[in-house]
Amino acid sequence: MIFIDACFKKPTPYTPIWMMRQAGRYLPEYMEVRKQAGDFLSLCKDYKKASEVSLQPIDILNVDAAIIFSDILVVPLEMGMNLRFEKGEGPIFDNPISTLEDLEKLDDQNAHKKLNYVYNALKLTREKLSQNKALIGFCGSPWTIATYMIEGSGSKNYAKCKKMLYQNPELLHKILNKLTQVLKLYLEEQIKAGANAIQIFDSWASALEYDKFFEFSFSYMLEISNFIKSKYPNIPVILFPKGISGYLDRIDGNFDVFGVDWSTPLDLARDKLSHKYALQGNMEPCRLYDKNAIKEGVEKILKTMQNKAHIFNLGHGILPDIPVENAKYFIKLVQESSAK
């Protein structure tokens, strides 16, 4: 698999590419299946439909890897939190965590066993996927998942989380540790079900100041990565902490690929990290609105990463109103322009 080879810094015939949120609302085919499912969470839980939408970008765009269709918040959901998605508001937990008692109510022993719909979707997708295409499993980082569990929803300033971080750091560490143990088992089950690679999304990494990022986020991501790498050395682990270009000097640990977001200059990440890791990223997602902007972005990134291990991706998820034609153009352009 070209994607897996690139993760391990092996030579590839061209630069492999996939897109975050590639199974998503910009595809009419996705919208049709989502309509049939009823709502977002029902789609996540219907493993046949989740598999179908995971495969759509392979069939429509010819990307080099599929990522399983799911959501990072199914983990706290199956630990016992009440999750719902409100239109225009995103995810909401009706019972956010603010005390040790709240935390102790959550089931960390059986949560990974209740996520069979994810494993079944992975199994089915791997069966249907051609052998040269990789299948990516994923989870959120403990910190990013915890922000939703504590805030009760998305947040602009993470005031509740940060209040806990500074007033009661022991409780926050207990929450993060509990999540970390569940996520290890969850990812292991994903690998057993057919995932060829794992990505850990730390979407809200940049909410933390320098030292606190390494204490409350990165250390837990590394604990998960160390667990996976010790048991499954042939499974590449991708870490994607978003928005921490100022923290790259201290990025070190046992993982394979560093995901670069679009706000981080790729040459900076290359100079600091490419001797240790393959890099993934990092085109500005809004460039996909315009073919000239796509061409310019692709050329610049391929030039920056010339002769370095690289997986092409956007620097964040594809937006819902991107024309499919532009997404197809982007994928083909990367594969053809980078062909050795």
UniProtKB/Swiss-Prot annotation:
Annotated site (Transition state stabilizer): D71
Amino acids binding substrate: R21, Q22, A23, G24, R25, D71, Y148, S203, H316
The protein's assembly and partners: Homodimer.
Pfam short name (any one): URO-D
Originating gene: hemE
Pathway assigned to this chain's UniProt record: Porphyrin-containing compound metabolism; protoporphyrin-IX biosynthesis; coproporphyrinogen-III from 5-aminolevulinate: step 4/4
GO cellular component: cytosol
EC number: 4.1.1.37
Entry keyword Cytoplasm: yes
Catalytic reaction annotation: uroporphyrinogen III + 4 H(+) = coproporphyrinogen III + 4 CO2
Listed name of the protein: Uroporphyrinogen decarboxylase
A GO term for molecular function: uroporphyrinogen decarboxylase activity
Top-level class of the enzyme under EC nomenclature: lyase
Localization of this protein: Cytoplasm
Keywords: Cytoplasm, Decarboxylase, Lyase, Porphyrin biosynthesis
